[in-house]
Structure formats: C-alpha cells, structure tokens
Swiss-Prot record:
Record's protein name: UDP-N-acetylglucosamine--N-acetylmuramyl-(pentapeptide) pyrophosphoryl-undecaprenol N-acetylglucosamine transferase
Record-linked InterPro entries: GlcNAc_MurG (IPR006009), Glyco_trans_28_C (IPR007235), GlycoTrans_28_N (IPR004276)
A GO BP annotation: cell division
Gene3D superfamilies for the chain: Glycogen Phosphorylase B
SUPFAM superfamilies in the cross-refs: UDP-Glycosyltransferase/glycogen phosphorylase (SSF53756)
Pathway assignment: Cell wall biogenesis; peptidoglycan biosynthesis
Catalysed reaction equations from the record: di-trans,octa-cis-undecaprenyl diphospho-N-acetyl-alpha-D-muramoyl-L-alanyl-D-glutamyl-meso-2,6-diaminopimeloyl-D-alanyl-D-alanine + UDP-N-acetyl-alpha-D-glucosamine = di-trans,octa-cis-undecaprenyl diphospho-[N-acetyl-alpha-D-glucosaminyl-(1->4)]-N-acetyl-alpha-D-muramoyl-L-alanyl-D-glutamyl-meso-2,6-diaminopimeloyl-D-alanyl-D-alanine + UDP + H(+)
Main location: membrane
Similarity section: Belongs to the glycosyltransferase 28 family. MurG subfamily.
Topology in the lipid bilayer: Peripheral membrane protein
C-alpha cells in the first residue's frame, strides 16, 4: 500500500455516498482507506459493508440545542478533538478528506494540528457549518456547485462524486415518439409525504390521453396509503416503498419529480434527466432551493416551491411538457451538459496533489 488516507463523512447518505465513491478511487490507486465517523450516522451501516475500517468519535451538532447542551458543548468538542487526534496519530494518513457531517469539524482541526494535509468537499450549493469553518485551514476546498465558496487559489469546482453506472448517454432511453412518458417520483429513502399527497391529486387532473406511466417511491411507512390515494382517484401507478436499483430507475424515467438534495441533483445531471424540483422547505439555510437553481438556471429543471404549488398548478405544468415531448428532450440535453463524470477522480487528484506537497 502507498499509505493511509482518512475520509471523514457522516450522518446522512448525502455525505456518505460521495465519500464511498472517493474511497473506491483511493483503493484503486493503491491507498488504504480509513473512515472517521460518529456512532449514530448512516456510516455505521454502509462503511463496514464496504469493507472499510471505521473509527468513531463522539460529536453532535449544536443547532436547535437547549441551554444545557450548549453549556456542555465546549467540553464535548474538546473531547471529540482529542479522540480525532488519537486516530490521526495512530494512522499517520498522507491526507485527510472531509465530506461533511458533524465529524468533519474536530477531525479537520485534528488534521491541521498534526500537520496532515486537509481537503474538504461540499456537496450542496450552500456550505455547511463544518465546511465553512474548515475552509480557511484546508489545503484544497472542493465544491460541487460553482461559487459555493469565495474565490481563491485553493477553490476547485469538481461536481459531486456519483456512481459511474448512473451516467447515461443520449441514446440510453427509447425515443418518446409513440409511447407514454415515464414519470419517476422520488421522496428519498424515507419518502416525502407532501409529494405522496400531491402527486395522485395532480395526476388525476392530467388528461388521460397524455397521462404518464408512473413509478412512485413513497417510503416504507407511506407506500400503502400512497397506493390507496392513487386507486381512489383512478390513476394507475407502481408505488414502491424503496427503490434499490436507482440506475435502472433513472434509465426507465423520462421525467423526475423529487426533492433537491445535492446528490439527487448531481444524479439527475449524470442520468440526463429533466426534473420538477420541490425543495424541502425547512432544509438548513434553504440549501435545497439553491441546489435546485443549478438545474433551473440551465433549463434542465423547474422549481416548484412546496408552499405555493397545489395540485392544479402541478397538473398544468405536467400537461404542458407531456403534450410537448420536445421540451423534455431539450431539458434532458441541458441536464446532461451539467454532468461531471470526472468528479471522483478530480477530488482524489486534489487530495494526492496536496499529499505530495
């Protein structure tokens, strides 16, 4: 092995999945990858399954915490810093890559105190608290979307690391001529109940002759009631609690209605898919709206704020594009033009460049 690399990412799939893509690239180049996470995040399931050693530190966020937690926070942060220092001194990594989550704060500071080159990557169009704090001390600051960070010599716009099988060329789908449009509705692994309620009502108002084929991922807790909503309004739909093969789902789809998480937006570009984007209204710093605007500005997507989009409005917008397939083709081309197939390699290149000094 050429040396150890320490990846820091935790909490949600939006941080962990891009980090796993980077881990595979490091391994392909002959490096041993270790992972720094927290005991409660999704990394506790995904990282061991990927065969990577997972080191845990105790750290949590401060937003929305009560006075008692805030008083205890400095001691807890100091404890997590010492835990991260211990891991880094044990591993002696050639570089540390942080992709977000609470773990990256103490982990990034520990890297700096140990003189280990630090690279950070921000998946969203608005930088998270940890990455904003670490940007001044990082050797490279990678961003998925342009201008997330202030301009500097160390800023690098890379895109988001996305699984290679999601990248589809313009000929991967059957032509739209002579068939129904395929509509994919995604609410994330837990489902998005506002979408589960809105879509059946809206699609019932779309004329039958242009109504799309529907595949709706509703979440495990909401799949049965969502299917019943479709039956109630006499709309045929394939409702699933979860979609495990996203590559196949994207290859089937012609249009997607979904939230605007950073990874979802990047996957839409990779798959060359037009989208109606309904950002999560309570996302921190409204980052999902900013993510969505990346597609909307280029004509690859339409922004539908949850608070102001009713069934009639959604039905009208759907009917417009369903009656004019050339609009969907144009949106798909624009989405494909935004894809960053080299994102994973670019992030890893940046890490190894600073590791070499």
């Amino acid at each position: 092995m050429k040396g150890n690399v320490l990846i820091m990412a935790g909490g949600t799939g939006g941080h962990v999945f891009p980090a796993l893509a980077c881990a595979r690239e490091f391994q392909a180049r002959g490096y041993a990858v270790h992972w720094l996470g927290t005991p409660r995040g999704i990394e506790n399931d995904l990282v061991p399954k990927a065969g990577l050693p997972l080191h845990l530190i105790q750290v949590s966020g401060l937003r929305g915490k009560g006075l008692k937690s805030l008083v205890k926070a400095p001691l807890e942060l100091l404890k997590s810093l010492f835990q991260a220092l211990r891991v880094i001194r044990q591993l002696r990594p050639v570089c540390v890559l942080g992709l977000g989550g609470y773990v990256t704060g103490p982990g990034g500071l520990a890297a700096r105190l140990n003189g280990v080159p630090l690279v950070i990557h921000e998946q969203n169009a608005v930088a998270g608290t940890a990455n904003r704090s670490l940007a001044p001390i990082a050797r490279r600051v990678c961003e998925a979307f342009p201008d997330t960070f202030p301009a500097s010599d160390k800023r690098l716009t890379t895109g988001n690391p996305v699984r290679g099988e999601l990248f589809l060329d313009a000929h991967a789908r059957a032509p739209l001529t002579g068939r129904r449009v395929n509509l994919l509705v995604l609410g994330g692994s837990l489902g998005a109940e506002p979408l589960n309620k809105l879509l059946p009502e809206a699609l019932a108002q779309v004329p039958l002759e242009i109504r799309p084929a529907i595949r709706h991922q509703a979440g495990r807790q909401h799949a049965e009631i969502t299917a019943e909503r479709y039956r109630t309004v006499a709309v045929e739909a394939d409702v699933a609690p979860f979609i495990s093969d996203m590559a196949a789902a994207y290859a089937w789809a012609d249009l997607v209605i979904c939230r605007a998480g950073a990874l979802t937006v990047s996957e839409l570009a990779a798959a060359g898919l037009p989208a109606f984007l309904v950002p999560l209204p309570h996302a921190i710093d409204d980052h999902q709206t900013r993510n969505a605007e990346f597609l909307v500005r280029s004509g690859a997507g339409r922004l539908l704020p949850q608070k102001s989009t009713g069934a009639a409005e959604l039905a009208a917008q759907l009917s417009e594009v369903l009656m004019h397939p050339e609009t969907l083709r144009s949106m798909a081309d624009q989405a494909r033009s935004l894809a960053k197939p080299e994102a994973t390699r670019t992030v890893v290149d940046a890490c190894l460049e600073v590791a070499r000094g």
